[in-house]
Amino acid sequence: MTKKVGLLVMAYGTPYKDEDIERYYTDIRHGHKPSEEMIADLRGRYHAIGGLSPLAKITEAQAYGLEKALNDAQDEVEFKAYIGLKHIEPFIEDAVEAMHKDGIEEAISIVLAPHYSSFSVEAYNKRAKDAADKLGGIHIQAINDWYKQPKFIQMWADRINETAKQIPAEELIDTVLIVSAHSLPEKIKQHNDPYPDQLQETADLIFDKVAVPHYALGWQSEGKTGEPWLGPDVQDLTRELYGREKYKHFIYTPVGFVAEHLEVLYDNDYECKVVTDEVGAAYHRPPMPNADPEFLEVLRTVVWDAYTK
């Protein structure tokens, strides 16, 4: 009989419909209800990208696509995917409970974010472990990060090189690659959190494989908390680089994200483009991984390597 293993795929979550926006935002704010102004601002950003974020459907396609890729590649183990979200149902705890009800005793978990941070991935893993410990009978093996997987680096390099082909050859010298991820509060540095170094390493590994001659590291989508966050912000970085180097082309590559959602469709495609338009440079962004076969193969390799090591 084939062994059955739970595949817990964790992600941030997004509102499914307009009525979800307030409770979703309240959850992000640890139970503090947002002001009407804050809700209107978030609703306005969703409106600017054409409605609600496509993230929910993409996360589903990634989770079930990964399940299929794992099961198609071997017949020793049957993986069963469960989606657990941080800020909306099905919550991480709901997914662990569903595994428990299905009689799953062994599971492997992956967060749909390649870099580890005590602030993000560790919080997901802790919630999953706490839920499993409370129910008893489920052992979850957690994957902490997967940014160094060679197929992940190659996937981004290929996408960047394809994007660079749209730029006239003689202007490639005036092109810069902006590699970015979600900013986090600066206080994580006090605890030697590996997150900033992991992003730097990702940028270095990708830059080694691309035809673009310049690159810079930026942060984006910081929270409105009043405390300092990791910088430079990608918009400030764009202005600074243009002012100093007069680059004609900016290729934005938000490698900390794996799907087209608000932070990419608004913070990059709208806000960064506003800045490139302002300075007279061209905006470019390679397609996000979403549930593309190359990305499902990245995830399959990550999970299978972790499971079999």
From Swiss-Prot:
Pathway: Porphyrin-containing compound metabolism; protoheme biosynthesis. Its EC number is 4.99.1.9. Keywords: Cytoplasm, Heme biosynthesis, Iron, Lyase, Metal-binding, Porphyrin biosynthesis. The keyword Transferase does not apply. GO terms for cellular component: cytoplasm. CDD domains: Ferrochelatase_C, Ferrochelatase_N. It catalyses: Fe-coproporphyrin III + 2 H(+) = coproporphyrin III + Fe(2+). Fe-coproporphyrin III binds at residues 12, 29, 45-46, 53, 124. The keyword Iron applies. It is found in: Cytoplasm. Gene3D superfamilies: 3.40.50.1400. InterPro entries: Ferrochelatase, Ferrochelatase_AS, Ferrochelatase_C, Ferrochelatase_N. Its main location: cytoplasm. Fe(2+) binds at residues 182, 263. Pfam families: Ferrochelatase. It is an enzyme of class 4 (lyase). One of its GO terms (biological process) is heme biosynthetic process. One of its GO terms (molecular function) is ferrochelatase activity. Involved in coproporphyrin-dependent heme b biosynthesis. Catalyzes the insertion of ferrous iron into coproporphyrin III to form Fe-coproporphyrin III. Belongs to the ferrochelatase family. This is Coproporphyrin III ferrochelatase. It comes from Listeria innocua serovar 6a (strain ATCC BAA-680 / CLIP 11262).
